[in-house]
Amino acid sequence: MKRILFYAAAMLLACTTMSSFAQESIKIPQLSTTQTIEQELGLGKITLTYARPNIRGRKVFGKLVPYGEVWRLGANSATIIKFSDEVTLEGNKIPAGEYGMFAIPTQDEWTIILNKNAHQWGAYTYKEADDFLRFKVKNVHHDSPLETMTMWFGNVDMNKGELEMRWANEGFLLHVSTDVDAKVMANIDQVMNKDQKPYFTAALYYYQNGKDLKQALEWIRTAEKSEPKSPFYKVWEARIQLKMGDKAGALATAQEGVKYAQEQKDTEYEGLNKAVADLAKS
């Protein structure tokens, strides 16, 4: 009986202790918060996840982040970059996939590393043998310090952009691009042989990428047949004519677009057609 009472008391104490530990488990904010950013590029996207340390009065590069040593490019877990499609990064072809992103800073340049082991805590288990790629870029010095490490995409076009990192007074800039033209052209050839033809989308791609403008004009006019008084189609028809060098045709088309927009009380496309008309007059 005494033994039973002893075990019961022990179990009660254990449960009480575990309950106490459970009550003490609280969630607090991270010193270095995590950010995930996604950027569309071409037909795919780039996803970047990293933790953002702050200066907090410390000397960063050359001390907190030693020169000449592999750095996780942030805090906590190593930075992860994921490409849904093949890209070119600073002239290097990168297959679609997920990579751990590290860097080795010096006063004048950075060694950027893409490692095949994407999920690591810091750089403690980093192995150079797992590197997919290393390349160097110049250090970009800034006169004004930035408290929180920040990475972002800038100067983004349909198929190219820049990935920039900045912290304290230092940083770097990477050029990234993707080649989608062959895919899009093959897709256009395929779908234009079907019953439901996306005339406008095909015309828009030809216009934006300097393809056969006569074909683009033919397609936009075919698309326009479904809505012959559309100021939307008129502005694009006029833009194509203007790019072909047909200023007189562009002016006449844009003026039609202005007329239809006014009839429909569409101030946005009235303004857009007027803008093309003004260019055609110049």
Segments (PLM) and residue ranges:
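Alpha-helical adaptor scaffolds
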Residues: 185-241, 245-252, 256-260, 266-267
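TPR/TPR-like alpha-solenoid helical repeat scaffolds
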Residues: 239-243, 265-282
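Short, hydrophobic/aromatic-rich beta-strand segments within well-structured domains
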Residues: 1, 100-102
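Bacterial Sec-dependent N-terminal signal peptides
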Residues: 1-25
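A short structural micro-motif
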Residues: 105-106, 243, 260, 279
